[in-house]
Amino acid sequence: MSEIKTYVIRAIVTFNASHYPMKQKVVKYVRALNEKQALEYLYSYLGSKNKVKRYNIKIEEIKEIPVEEAKDKTVRDLAKLNKIIM
């Protein structure tokens, strides 16, 4: 069974590209099995919350980090769980 890892993704996102483009740096902490899934989650998250197209997201860095270094409390709490009952 694969182990879930914690990734930090740094990107530059162009918001409102069609009218008045505004670039902004984004840092997102993600729990995923590999870098590809972490990147896909970022695209999905920014697309659904901010209506940003994939070609408006420029990835600067994807790095695996220890759970303790994650600044997002939700990510740290999810890492502590042994199992989830639905």
From Swiss-Prot:
Signal peptide: none annotated. One of its GO terms (molecular function) is structural constituent of ribosome. Disulfide bonds: none annotated. It comes from the Archaea. Pfam families: Ribosomal_L18A. The keyword RNA-binding applies. GO terms for cellular component: ribonucleoprotein complex; ribosome. GO terms for biological process: translation. InterPro entries: Ribosomal_eL20, Ribosomal_eL20_dom. Keywords: Ribonucleoprotein, Ribosomal protein, RNA-binding, rRNA-binding. Part of the 50S ribosomal subunit. Binds 23S rRNA. HAMAP family: Ribosomal_eL20 (MF_00273). Belongs to the eukaryotic ribosomal protein eL20 family. This is Large ribosomal subunit protein eL20. It comes from Sulfurisphaera tokodaii (strain DSM 16993 / JCM 10545 / NBRC 100140 / 7) (Sulfolobus tokodaii). The lineage of its organism: Archaea, Thermoproteota, Thermoprotei, Sulfolobales, Sulfolobaceae.
